[in-house]
Every structure is written in C-alpha cells, then in structure tokens.
Swiss-Prot record:
<dbReference type="GO" id="GO:0006974">
    <property type="term" value="P:DNA damage response"/>
</dbReference>
<feature type="binding site">
    <location>
        <position position="98"/>
    </location>
    <ligand>
        <name>Fe cation</name>
    </ligand>
</feature>
<keyword id="KW-0560">Oxidoreductase</keyword>
<dbReference type="InterPro" id="IPR005123">
    <property type="entry name" value="Oxoglu/Fe-dep_dioxygenase_dom"/>
</dbReference>
<protein>
    <recommendedName>
        <fullName>PKHD-type hydroxylase RPA3479</fullName>
        <ecNumber>1.14.11.-</ecNumber>
    </recommendedName>
</protein>
<keyword id="KW-0479">Metal-binding</keyword>
<feature type="binding site">
    <location>
        <position position="161"/>
    </location>
    <ligand>
        <name>Fe cation</name>
    </ligand>
</feature>
<dbReference type="GO" id="GO:0031418">
    <property type="term" value="F:L-ascorbic acid binding"/>
</dbReference>
<feature type="binding site">
    <location>
        <position position="171"/>
    </location>
    <ligand>
        <name>2-oxoglutarate</name>
    </ligand>
</feature>
<keyword id="KW-0847">Vitamin C</keyword>
<dbReference type="GO" id="GO:0006879">
    <property type="term" value="P:intracellular iron ion homeostasis"/>
</dbReference>
<dbReference type="Pfam" id="PF18331">
    <property type="entry name" value="PKHD_C"/>
</dbReference>
<feature type="domain" description="Fe2OG dioxygenase">
    <location>
        <begin position="78"/>
        <end position="180"/>
    </location>
</feature>
<dbReference type="InterPro" id="IPR023550">
    <property type="entry name" value="PKHD_hydroxylase"/>
</dbReference>
<dbReference type="InterPro" id="IPR041097">
    <property type="entry name" value="PKHD_C"/>
</dbReference>
<dbReference type="Pfam" id="PF13640">
    <property type="entry name" value="2OG-FeII_Oxy_3"/>
</dbReference>
<dbReference type="InterPro" id="IPR006620">
    <property type="entry name" value="Pro_4_hyd_alph"/>
</dbReference>
Amino acid sequence: MLVCIPEVLPKSEVAEFRRLMDAADWEDGRSTAGAQSAMVKRNEQLPPDSDLARALGRRIVSALTGNPKFVSAAVPLQIFPPLFNRYAASGGHHFGIHVDNAVRGDHLTGLRIRTDLSVTLFLAEPDEYDGGELVIEDTYGSHEVKLAAGDAVLYPSTSLHMVTPVTRGARVASFFWLQSMIRDAQARSMIYDLDNAIQALVERLGRDDPETVKLTGIYHNLIRYWAEV
C-alpha cells in the first residue's frame, strides 16, 4: 500500500526548514547505510545526531501524529527520528535499487524498531530539480513519486526502491521509518480501507447513525485483534 499525504508541512514551515538546512554542514549519506545500501548510495545527509536534525525531526513527527490520514494508514507505534538528505546534480547523486534494513536503532535514545513502513517527506518543489524520482516497486509494478514540498509518501519498508539520478538542482527531503501497531501489511491495508469507508459514511449519515456506530465498533475490534503494543 502506497499512500500520499498532502500538506504535512505548510509552505511557510518548509521555507524555514530549508533556510536552516542550507546553512548547516552536511556529511556523506553512506554513514547511515547498511552494507548493501552503501554500495549504491550517493547523497549528502544532515548529521543524524545534530541538534538541527533532532529539532526538525521532532517537528515532523508532531505534524504527522496530528495528521488523520497518516495515523489511519500507518497505525503508528514507534516513529524513528527523521533523517534529512540532499541529492545534488553537482555531486552526481542518486540511490540505486535497495531495500531498507529490517531493524533500525537510535543510539541516542535507545529506540529500536522493526521497520514496517518507510516515509519520505519532500522539502523541495518538483520544479527545483530534474530527476530525483523515488521509484517504488511492488507486485503491481514500479511507481514514480515526486511530490510537492511539504507532502509525504508512506510505503512498505519491504519494497525495493531507488532514487533516480538528479541532473539539475537539488532534491531535499526527510526520510524515516516506523513500526506499526499492525505488523501484517494486508491487515493494515484493510484497516485503512475500512476507516476510509467509515469516514465517508459519517459524512453522509452522521456519526450517530446505527450502522456507522456498528462499523466503528468492528474497526476497533479488528485493531484490538491485530494490534501489538
């Protein structure tokens, strides 16, 4: 399940992020890559332990946990501290096909998560750079994602994916992973579809409609059945 989430951050906040990031020191992005990923990763990254990366990351997590679409699709249990990368044409940056590590650990907080879902939050407008598409492969083929600044995409961490070479400008983004309360991707997808159907019925029939109440009960009972907390 691939879900695009618009306007996670307003344009004004994106501009503030970019101003702070443009003034920061960047390092080789391979510092946080696994052995296989490091072979195909060419980009820059804000030092993950820097005060700036941590502060901006907390703002992103706060925005996402208050976003109903994100919460519905992810059913998040633990969110890894967001990281930040930059793909510049001048550096020939790209990230070849790879799969994310199954487990991520943060040595500052001691947090360890199973990576169920991956998130990319775009911080550069599509017309700022050429190339740099996030290409995600699943059983239905390849999907190219290049969203407006402030928008995010959520997809299974089991997916093979890549970032195509940037040939003009620079692609700036935040990326991170999360552990869902619902481990099984198919179950999580059904929960998301059910929640969307319930919200549509609420709009048409009202929250107090008996059938809407019954479906809401089924939704919560399925969460209770599948959740690992």
